[in-house]
A protein has these predicted regions:
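Contiguous beta-strand/loop segments that form the cofactor/metal-binding neighborhood of enzyme cores
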Residues: 183-254, 273, 283-294, 327-328
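Short acidic low-complexity segments
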Residues: 51-63
Length: 328
């Protein structure tokens, strides 16, 4: 496989994780861009990066850049996605990949028009344990899926300027942590949910700080999701089938799953991969998609999850400034 040259736009916590993963893989993190020049310089020195850019467009116009990783706040993603894709760059973009379905559709069309790969950096889809579980489910050992339960809760001190609660930064639980829970649901469900019921509590800033969501698809498979920015919960996902259930803790980057079989109650513990290598798996899968010219990094799931989040926010009447009057 060719040695691809990467650029990272944004050098916060997750940007540092990507750089460390690139080092572990012996990859080529060739350039960095950040709105604060001094921060970008420090980042480049720390990781031995050749090029530092102050302007995103300079990254996009650099012919030596093959893949751009975007880890800026998610309300800014679309403004970087479109010019990067139009410049012929493959893009791996942090979750949530866009604010709404309309933005994602625009980005997807742009990627298709320019023959490049666009993917969301959703760790869950690339962890080896999920691929192993998919094989188990396909074998029929668990029977048909019936129900999924999801929890994800963090405790954040309320601060109107913090990105979690700031409407101008597209804050709220759904786009930040709910995207993981919905991605889990979509991975295990046989088709997209088409019925949605939900309740939400909004923060004083107008973003969602706590929510309960119920989903069902045409096969009768159901899921419940509990999300909160004010109550710590275990990151627990449970998928129940006719013949047993799968339980996964720390599901965004899981490497272990426990399967309990209904008939006799015995349990199997599956282990695959490593939580510490989550971003390495993303990088490898992205480079593989680029090498084979395919949009095969779970893009269909990304689209379905974005459609769900857009519909849920429409139920809540929650919009962001960029949407000019309505979630799209």
């Amino acid at each position: 496989m060719p040695a691809y040259r990467w650029a990272t736009l944004g050098c916060g916590v997750i940007g540092n994780e990507l750089a460390q993963a690139m080092q572990a893989l012996g990859g080529n993190l060739y350039s960095v861009g950040n709105r604060t020049h001094e921060k970008a310089l420090s980042f480049a020195e720390k990781y031995g990066i050749a090029k530092v850019y102050d302007k995103p467009e300079d990254i996009f116009s650099d012919p030596d850049v093959d893949i751009v990783y975007i880890s800026t706040p998610h309300n800014t993603h679309i403004r970087y996605l479109l010019p990067a894709l139009a410049a012929g760059k493959h893009v791996l973009c942090e979750k949530s990949i866009t604010l709404n379905s309309l933005e994602l559709d625009q980005a997807r069309r742009c990627a298709d028009e320019h023959g490049v790969v666009l993917a969301e950096a959703m760790t869950l889809y690339h962890m080896p344990i999920y691929k192993q579980l998919a094989d188990l489910i396909r074998s029929g050992a668990l029977g048909p899926l019936r129900f999924i339960q999801m929890n994800f809760g963090s405790y954040k001190e309320y601060d109107m300027n913090n990105r979690f609660f700031n409407r101008s930064l597209a804050g709220g639980a759904l786009l930040d942590i709910g995207v993981y829970a919905l991605s889990f649901v979509r991975y295990f469900m046989s088709c997209q949910p088409d019925q949605i019921a939900s309740q939400v509590r909004l923060a004083p800033t107008g973003v969602d700080e706590q929510a309960g969501i119920l989903l069902q698809n045409r096969e009768g498979e159901m899921a419940t999701l509990s999300l909160s920015l004010h109550a710590k919960q275990p990151k627990r996902g449970m998928a129940a089938f006719d013949k047993g259930y799968i339980e996964i803790y720390d599901y965004p980057r899981a490497d272990t799953a426990t399967i309990t079989y209904t008939a006799d109650g015995h349990q199997d513990v599956l282990q695959a991969g490593s939580q510490a290598k989550a971003l390495q798996y993303e990088i490898r899968d992205m480079e593989d998609a680029v090498a084979h010219g395919g949009q095969d990094m779970c893009q269909a799931y990304t689209k379905d999850v974005m459609d769900l989040m857009t519909a849920i926010r429409q139920q809540w009447g929650l919009t962001y400034p960029e949407e000019e009057g309505g979630a799209q």
